[in-house]
Amino acid sequence: MIPEFAIREWSEHVPWTESEQVEQDLLICRALTEIYKDEYLASHLAFRGGTALHKLFLSPQPRYSEDIDLVQINAEPIKETYDHIRDALAFLGEPKVKQKKHNNTLIFRLESESIPVVPIHLKVEINCKEHFSVLPMQRMPFSVVNKWYNGKCDVLTYQLDELVGTKLRALYQRRKGRDLYDLYKALTTSDINIDNVLACYQKYMEFVAVSYTHLRAHETSAHL
């Protein structure tokens, strides 16, 4: 999909040594730009997760991150959002869609231009449950400059303290070394307000606890 000369050019801007990682990174950056160039998506989805942390706040990017994590701002049907994402990311082909009650994922599958050819997956995951932010959201400029693609947008995202707070919560939800690494890099290389981080962490943990309580109550009533 991407000419080899464009991949070589992009390798000058990212620290990855494998050609397929450079290629996937460029695809991710274009995908992010196309999503937030769409007026509907730009007002309905917020960018969160490790890729948001690394692409918007930590420079140079310290860790390879291959997913785009988004949060649905308002509680509403997801179909129109799906349609807009499909249109915005048509250059990636048709995605496989995995739907869950509170989480929806579009998976795009491609093959690398590098030899030997390896599969490249780009996952766009939408959280359809946490329709809130603790701190005011913000828009941050993002751009891609490459012979294959040029584009820019304003990405709706969370403040750094809130992103770090959700990373802290992730440590209690899963056992992923990348969460601990992301916390370490953010705390040692950025200007972090620890009080804000802990306040955000507490709010998200309270939300998880309330959601779990409601789930258990629903399961109990279903068996009565």
Where are these regions (language model features)?
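Structured mid-to-C-terminal alpha-helical surface segments
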Residues: 1-45, 56-63, 68, 72-216, ...
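Glycine-rich beta-strand-to-loop/alpha-helix junction loops that act as flexible
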Residues: 47-52
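Cytosolic catalytic cores of cyclic-nucleotide second-messenger enzymes
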Residues: 224
